[in-house]
Amino acid sequence: MKQKAIYPGTFDPFTNGHLDVLERALTIFEEVIVVIAENSQKRALFSIEERKMMTEQIVSNVDGARVEVLAHGLLANYARDVGARAIVRGVRQVKDFEYEFQMSLLNRQLCPEITTVFLMPNVKYTYVASSIIKEVAMLGGDVSNFVHPIVLSMINDKRALCER
């Protein structure tokens, strides 16, 4: 049986840190589905369709990875429905872990057969967050070391629209 996991997030935008966690997950699982979800508590720069498109382009050459959208519903149920055995979460710092630990316990109550796997990114990405990338980029800062060129181009396009 093929070992499958999901890697959920808003990915607004998908960063090199996200890619690093995905690649680490693929050393454990044969298939990882990057699940792009909405989060009503976050203000998105990119539409869910834009995020899916950018992420698909970035991971197109990553064996074992594919991208899906979860428009609504519980993540644990989605994981079970697609046959995933695990939910992969990137953890950069203690604050991330506290939140993710709570979510892990809730998901375990909802679907006991699904486990959560916490992966730390490469140390050079521990301070990289999508929210920081967006803020720095929209203020004209150089974020090219933290995002794929596709993302950089899309951010620059958004910034140009805002400057009009």
From Swiss-Prot:
Keywords: ATP-binding, Coenzyme A biosynthesis, Cytoplasm, Magnesium, Nucleotide-binding, Nucleotidyltransferase, Transferase. GO terms for biological process: coenzyme A biosynthetic process. Its cofactor is Mg(2+). The keyword ATP-binding applies. Belongs to the bacterial CoaD family. Reversibly transfers an adenylyl group from ATP to 4'-phosphopantetheine, yielding dephospho-CoA (dPCoA) and pyrophosphate. HAMAP family: PPAT_bact. Its main location: cytoplasm. It is an enzyme of class 2 (transferase). Substrate binds at residues 10, 42, 75, 89. Its EC number is 2.7.7.3. The record marks 18 as: Transition state stabilizer. It catalyses: (R)-4'-phosphopantetheine + ATP + H(+) = 3'-dephospho-CoA + diphosphate. ATP binds at residues 10-11, 18, 90-92, 100, 125-131. Pathway: Cofactor biosynthesis; coenzyme A biosynthesis; CoA from (R)-pantothenate: step 4/5. It comes from Chlorobium chlorochromatii (strain CaD3). Homohexamer. This is Phosphopantetheine adenylyltransferase. One of its GO terms (molecular function) is ATP binding.
